[in-house]
């Protein structure tokens, strides 16, 4: 590069024009080549259904290839947490203990596996989990896989072209089509051989000894699995290799730009949010006063008149949880859309803290109703799910309050608490 610049300077009489570097030719690493070929097997196993040995083999292969592609890179401590959650859910499915979440367990397994791959490769926008969760999820499930969707076929073509590199140049597409043609010709040869054997008994007896060794039935389901495993494998390789190849400085820069864009949303006067937050706080306070006997009956194990335990415990439980979720949305709007930082306005900060305390009271009320129900009728998977939801919402209120009062980030702690508790419930 320096030599080129010197030559350009001499030729231009001291005036240097920018010298653009040529794009480097595509050259995958040996690790990427190994991963590309192994994922053909992994994707086919995946299409066979993630049960019993298939699940174990696929997860082990996914973890091994992720580690292979990111070997030598620094590992964040939280990546161990996501790997642990992935392992716990896998074991629960293998041991058939995923009674609490049932069919949702596979969905959670996919989410944790993708998040672990992002964390292990350093592919999270901020370098760690946090409030950029929606954008990181978009990267993990869409941008990385689909931007690098054809990376595997390019890698495979590069590897197959290796023995001929340095000789007469041949396009990667030529290699692929040649292999495809050989496979098709072999299949047609076997088919014609079978047809000739069916047409003539003498010919059938002549070749029966070695035809028996080639006698296998072409199962349509197998070909369908092979066909659909191709895009699945391309998606998986795009995720793993794409996140490993991503330039981390560009990712961090993009994360900072998103943060800057979020900070520029603050256009609403703080007084407006102060009045609106005060309105919500007064509404909840009025609700607590008017409905005190009904809401707090579970604490004294005294039911309101006309109610039975099951009706009292279930009525309004999910509505209370939805109110808490609505409060989180309101809190996000206040913190993001206020013209001035929230912590510079004491009245608004105090009202947000009161709102969180009322949300925590909603969680305690919902949990008391649930515990009354469980004490009478015992545990069931759905009641455990409900208990988990209330605990996660309550912990979220604590984290939000900590951030408001101390100005420190706590979203990652909330994510980890929710993830670890969800994974551990699979062991019930």
Predicted regions located by residue number:
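Membrane-embedded alpha-helical segments in integral membrane proteins
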Residues: 32-47, 87-94, 291, 366-370
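Alpha-helical transmembrane segments of multi-pass integral membrane proteins
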Residues: 140-155, 176-198, 228-234, 272-293, ...
């Amino acid at each position: 590069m320096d030599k080129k610049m010197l030559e350009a300077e001499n030729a231009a009489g001291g005036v240097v024009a920018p010298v653009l570097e040529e794009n480097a030719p595509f050259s995958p690493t040996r690790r990427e080549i190994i991963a590309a070929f192994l994922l053909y097997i992994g994707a086919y196993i995946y299409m066979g259904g993630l049960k019993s040995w298939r699940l174990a083999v696929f997860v082990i292969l996914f973890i091994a290839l992720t580690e292979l592609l990111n070997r030598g890179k620094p590992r964040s401590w939280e990546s161990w947490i996501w790997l642990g959650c992935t392992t716990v859910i896998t074991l629960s499915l293998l041991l058939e203990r995923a009674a609490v979440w049932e069919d949702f367990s596979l969905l959670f397994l996919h989410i944790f596996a993708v998040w672990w791959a992002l964390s292990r490769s350093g592919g999270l926008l901020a370098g760690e989990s946090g409030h950029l969760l929606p954008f990181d999820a978009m990267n993990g499930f869409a941008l990385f896989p689909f931007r690098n969707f054809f990376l595997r076929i390019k890698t495979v073509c590069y590897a197959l072209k290796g023995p001929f590199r340095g000789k007469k140049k041949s396009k990667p597409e030529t290699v692929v089509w040649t292999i495809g043609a050989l496979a098709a010709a072999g299949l047609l040869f076997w088919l014609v051989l079978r047809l000739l054997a069916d047409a003539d008994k003498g010919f059938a007896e002549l070749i029966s000894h070695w035809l028996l060794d080639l006698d296998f039935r072409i199962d349509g389901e197998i070909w369908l699995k092979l066909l659909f495993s191709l895009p699945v494998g391309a998606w998986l390789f795009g995720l793993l290799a794409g996140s490993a190849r991503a330039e981390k400085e560009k990712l961090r820069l993009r994360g900072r730009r998103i943060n800057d864009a979020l900070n520029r949303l603050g256009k609403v006067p703080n007084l407006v949010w102060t009045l609106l937050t005060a309105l919500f706080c007064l509404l909840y306070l009025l609700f607590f006063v008017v409905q005190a006997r009904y809401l707090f009956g579970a604490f004294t194990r005294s039911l309101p008149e006309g109610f039975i335990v099951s009706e009292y415990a279930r009525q309004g439980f999910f509505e209370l949880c939805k109110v808490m979720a609505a409060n989180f949305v309101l809190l996000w709007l206040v913190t993001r859309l206020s013209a001035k930082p929230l912590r510079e306005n004491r009245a608004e900060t105090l009202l947000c803290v009161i709102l969180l305390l009322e949300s925590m009271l909603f969680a305690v009320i919902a949990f008391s109703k649930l515990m009354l129900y469980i004490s009478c009728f015992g545990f069931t998977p759905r009641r455990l799910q409900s208990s988990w939801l209330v605990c996660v919402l309550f912990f979220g209120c604590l984290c939000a309050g900590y951030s408001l009062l101390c100005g420190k980030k706590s979203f990652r702690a909330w994510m980890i608490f929710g993830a670890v508790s969800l994974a551990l419930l699979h062991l019930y």
